[in-house]
A protein has these predicted regions:
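Non-catalytic, conserved peripheral segments adjacent to functional cores
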Residues: 1-69, 81-110
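Conserved SET/PR-domain catalytic core that frames the SAM/AdoMet-binding pocket
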Residues: 69-76
């Protein structure tokens, strides 16, 4: 295969670590889709649909057999809160690179 002739579309990923009692993310995107997976620890994922005002929270725990990949669509504000005693880590996947102009801060009242 000649990679010069074939367009390459990849997956962008990064790891976010969260200390106990802290929260990370606290934003939404107007264009970007993300998928997240808990890699370590126990964390609460807080979601708010910006357009509908609907809220949802769930606890993710790597010791649980039923956690997996979670899809976050545009206009869904998201926050990861470490509710465990040790460090938590989340892997974030996206089809597009990070765009600071598409990361809109959102205040969560948790």
């Amino acid at each position: 295969m000649n990679y010069m002739d074939t367009p390459f579309t990849g997956i962008h990923s990064y790891v976010v670590s969260v200390s106990p009692g802290r929260s990370r993310a606290n934003h939404y995107h107007e264009k970007k889709e993300e998928w997240i997976a808990l890699a370590a620890g126990t964390a609460a994922l807080h979601l708010v649909d910006i357009k509908k005002g609907e809220r949802e929270s769930m606890v993710l725990d790597t010791r649980s057999a039923d956690y997996g990949l979670i899809y976050i669509s545009p206009f869904i504000a998201h926050s990861i809160e470490n509710v465990g005693n040790g460090e938590a880590a989340v892997i974030v996947f996206s089809r597009t690179p990070e765009d600071p102009s598409d990361t809109i801060p959102f205040r969560f009242d948790i």
